[in-house]
Design a protein with these regions (language model features):
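N-terminal phosphate-binding caps/lids of nucleotide- and nucleic-acid-binding domains
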Residues: 59, 199, 210
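C-terminal helical "lid" of AAA+/P-loop NTPase domains
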Residues: 122, 187, 191, 201-208, ...
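Short, polar/flexible loop-turn hinges at active-site or ligand-entry regions and domain interfaces
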Residues: 66, 193-197, 230
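Alpha-helix N-cap/helix-initiation sites
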Residues: 17, 179, 198-199, 213-216
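Short, surface-exposed acidic/glycine-rich loop or hinge patches that mediate macromolecular interfaces
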Residues: 48, 98, 176-177, 196, ...
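Helix-loop-helix "sensor" segment of P-loop NTPases
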Residues: 172-175, 179-203
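Short, intrinsically disordered, charge-balanced linker/junction segments flanking boundaries
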Residues: 71, 231-237
Length: 237
């Protein structure tokens, strides 16, 4: 079996593990603790800042058997199913390649079905890539959402998402991390993984990561593989 990449190995499984997005963690946990979850969210921000990861954590806690203070337990069957990517309650769609009205109608039909868990969560990535007709089909469902259905729309370009869609979602904006935050995270990953690299390598991968946890860990993995500072790292989607 191939070894997991550092990014996948250290992908956050709880809100508390997310780096540099405290404002989003606070908003989501408060809404869950107070039972004021939205039926539709728009997560926007640069690539590699945790939008899809946060959506999956939200899906976990909304279906968790034993949530604690707005966090998923990460141990119940529902949480494990989401973590393993085989949950019937969580449906993900890459709108960059599935952007037509037929794709959205399939999602809408699925939303009307019952769910084994408490909530059915639909995660639509790169939602700004939807066609106008697909957006119109989605809008109708957002205006009259089925019971116990939550939509999480993720995008790197929120201005390309129709205003009517944006107005019917809770918009949470993800930010790139500061270099100091990335350096702290890299040092923690190195210690936990039992890896040793030079301070110059840490500085280089943080610089290459340019604020993205995903790109930083991809650069770190390449640097470890070649035994030193990687001059250029290829981003991983």
């Amino acid at each position: 079996m191939a070894a997991q990449s550092l990014y996948r190995r250290y992908r956050p499984q709880r809100f508390s593990e997310l780096k540099g997005q405290e404002h989003i963690v606070r908003a989501l946990k408060n809404s869950i603790v107070n039972s004021r979850e939205g039926h539709a969210y728009l997560f926007s921000g640069p690539r590699g800042t945790g939008k899809t990861t946060t959506a999956r954590i939200l899906a976990k806690v909304l279906n968790c058997d034993s949530p604690v203070d707005g966090e998923p337990c990460c141990a119940c069957p529902s949480c494990l199913a989401v973590q393993n990517g085989n949950s019937f309650d969580v449906i993900e769609l890459d709108a960059a390649s599935n952007n037509g009205v037929a794709d959205i109608r399939e999602i809408i039909a699925s939303a009307s079905l019952g769910s084994p868990g408490r909530n059915r969560v639909f995660i639509l990535d790169e939602v700004h890539m939807l066609t106008k007709s697909a957006e119109a089909a989605l809008l109708k469902t957002l205006e009259e959402p089925p019971t116990n259905v939550v939509f999480v729309l993720a995008t790197t370009d929120p201005q390309k998402v129709g205003e009517t869609i944006r107005s019917r979602t809770q918009h949470l904006q993800f930010h790139l991390l500061q270099e100091s935050e990335l350096e702290e995270h890299v040092r923690w990953v190195l210690a936990d993984a039992g890896l040793d690299v030079s301070p110059e390598t840490i500085e280089a991968v943080v610089r290459q990561g340019a604020g993205s946890v995903r790109d930083t860990l991809s650069a770190l993995e390449l640097a470890v593989a070649v035994g030193g500072i990687a001059e250029e790292a290829t981003p991983v989607d």
